[in-house]
From Swiss-Prot:
One of its GO terms (molecular function) is structural constituent of ribosome. The keyword Ribonucleoprotein applies. This is Small ribosomal subunit protein bS20. Residues 1-26 are annotated as: Disordered. The gene is rpsT. It comes from Glaesserella parasuis serovar 5 (strain SH0165). The lineage of its organism: Bacteria, Pseudomonadati, Pseudomonadota, Gammaproteobacteria, Pasteurellales.
Length: 87
């Protein structure tokens, strides 16, 4: 642990941010997994509904800087292509 007061504060803030970011990242991954699961069942309506929810979450995480914008785009395009195949 740091000795300087400001460094101690930064360490505490950093740990809080790390835990929050881990929680947000886990939540985002869960939404992505829900889309993959819906695609695996072959139900296009359920897949599209899950995709819309996932898209909102992924875009929010990208706008907040939790993931890169290109990574968000890759997730969305890959899953959109899989849903399109279900037709």
């Amino acid at each position: 642990m740091a000795n300087i007061k400001s460094a101690q504060k930064r360490a505490v803030q950093s740990e809080k941010r790390r835990q929050h970011n881990a929680s947000q990242r886990s939540m985002m991954r869960t939404f992505i997994k829900k889309v993959y699961a819906a695609v695996a069942t072959g139900d296009k309506a359920a897949s599209e509904a899950a995709f819309v929810e996932m898209q909102k979450v992924v875009d929010r995480m990208a706008s907040k800087g939790l993931i890169h914008a290109n990574k968000a785009a890759n997730h969305k395009s890959k899953l959109a292509a899989q849903i399109k195949k279900l037709a």
